[in-house]
Amino acid sequence: KEWQNYGIALSRTTMANWVIKAAELWLKPLYNLLHQKLLTANCLFVDETTTQVLREPDRKATSNSYMWLYRNSTDVDQQIILYQYSPTRAGENAEKFLSGYTGYIHCDGYEGYNKVKNVTRVGCLAHIRRKFHEGVPKTSTGKKSQCEIGLDYCNALFSIEKEIAHLPPEERLKKRKKKAIPVLKAFWGWVETTNALPSSVLGKALSYAKKQKPYLMNYLLDGECQI
């Protein structure tokens, strides 16, 4: 409308093309530079979420596409957060974006991340905690349920991380090992000895925890890693 006030008629298509061209000329080189910088990080955090795109060629407007997010650790001076659009959730997206990277990647249990090679994968306790939380009774029964016990273990580990969050990575790792390892041993012992129907909420939570154990325990390797 501002252009119209000057007697210049511009279509939405023309203005959209301006934005696209400006992004290609000025923003894409900056994005590529940040991408290169990101791949030098010690730790990366990766996630993907659904989104919908209108008028995408050969796809319905209701089709799910994905926005991938990559960021470095909060311990570094220069924070970098990059988004990448993809019409699919295929693991090849992360594999291509992280090509050449050999550090730690924090991600959930999505098997597509197995496509990323030569990295140390770090699991997410929040996803394990969520599984147990789903089985907590809505009303108190006086005695803690097994899901509540699992939730308590997760909360204890998160409390430790909250206590040591202000420390530099090296000191944080020392405190983490001292405080968290006993809790982790008790937690995994409980996971292995607790019985539940595989189809129950508790059974699914225990199964998920067992599958994620090798990845979750990797947060004990570096103070820059998160739980």
Where do the model's predicted regions map?
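Catalytic center-proximal scaffold of phosphoryl-transfer enzymes
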Residues: 1-227
